[in-house]
């Protein structure tokens, strides 16, 4: 039996069909050519760059409402460690791609907006593509309990762009940390070695901000939540041209977010 497709609670004011146009107008005004050149230079140096005010406020409110509703109905809490990333923890609530595809039209249209690919390509300095593995197109995650964290890890595909919907003050944790120019050896992962070999940088973000990461060679994490902070994000995976011809595995994504498996459909 196929899962029903439900309307988004957020589409009353912002229609899914208008997402691409809203983003194109906003990004042209917020990030003109000179600004994008500065972002590209920073990304070339740090392999991560923050994008303050990336999402226009009306769209942010609508996407946040949509994601919060989806999380309330479908979020699954995980408390795991992954040997493949040197036993780092994942303590978080998640919703995977199949549910969002059907019940999150704003998130879906945000990811597939051509302007998103063009913008990220300007920042990273090469063409980018939507992920060939549907399970990594977009996922929603939330940290909202003391100690919740998305621990140190790398990703298979080269790039990620993360849209921040809710964020605690940095004093409550939930900020991003990144270690560029590191290598993920899945057979012998070495988080401490990576921490010793390169500089750790930390980035605080606010709702509506986004950040782009070179995720396959930048070890990164979300600092554990302290107290009652709450962080909700949409993580979107983008592929380099080289990624399209490279064999990939999806161990951590499938364990945390379910990959392409639809949890609404019984076995």
What is the role of each PLM region?
Residues 174-175, 184-267:
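Catalytic core of Fe(II)/2-oxoglutarate
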Residues 53-54, 165-169, 241-242:
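Short loop segments at secondary-structure junctions
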Residues 53-74, 87-135:
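Signature of the catalytic double-stranded beta-helix
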Residues 42-48, 52-56:
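Short, contiguous, helix-prone interaction/anchoring segments in small proteins
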Residues 118-210, 216-217:
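Catalytic core of non-heme Fe(II) oxygenases with the double-stranded beta-helix
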Residues 1-44, 255-267:
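Fe(II)/2-oxoglutarate
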Residues 51, 159-161, 232-234:
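Hydrophobic residues positioned within well-ordered beta-strands of beta-sheet architectures
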């Amino acid at each position: 039996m196929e899962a029903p497709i439900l309307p988004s609670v957020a589409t009353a004011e912002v229609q899914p069909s208008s997402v691409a146009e809203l983003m194109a107008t906003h990004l042209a005004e917020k990030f003109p050519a000179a600004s994008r050149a500065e972002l590209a230079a920073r990304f070339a140096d740090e392999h991560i760059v923050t994008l303050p005010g990336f999402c226009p406020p009306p769209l942010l409110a609508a996407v946040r409402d949509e994601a919060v509703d989806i999380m309330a109905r479908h979020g699954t809490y995980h408390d795991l460690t992954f040997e493949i990333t040197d036993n780092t923890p994942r303590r978080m609530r998640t919703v995977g791609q199949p549910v969002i595809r059907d019940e999150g039209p704003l998130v879906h249209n945000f990811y597939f907006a051509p302007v998103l690919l063009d913008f990220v390509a300007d920042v990273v300095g090469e063409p980018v593509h939507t992920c060939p593995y549907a399970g990594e197109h977009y996922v929603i995650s939330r940290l909202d309990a003391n100690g919740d964290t998305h621990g140190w890890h790398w990703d298979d595909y080269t790039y990620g762009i993360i849209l921040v919907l809710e964020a605690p003050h940095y004093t409550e944790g939930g900020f991003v940390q990144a270690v560029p120019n590191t290598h993920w050896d899945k057979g012998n992962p070495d988080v401490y070695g990576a921490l010793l070999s390169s500089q750790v940088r930390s980035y605080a973000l606010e709702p509506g901000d986004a950040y782009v990461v070179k995720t396959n060679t930048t070890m990164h994490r979300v600092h554990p939540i302290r107290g009652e902070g709450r962080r909700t994000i949409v993580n979107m995976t983008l592929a380099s041209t080289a990624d399209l011809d490279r064999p990939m595995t999806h161990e951590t994504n499938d364990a945390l977010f379910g990959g392409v498996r639809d949890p609404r459909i019984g076995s």
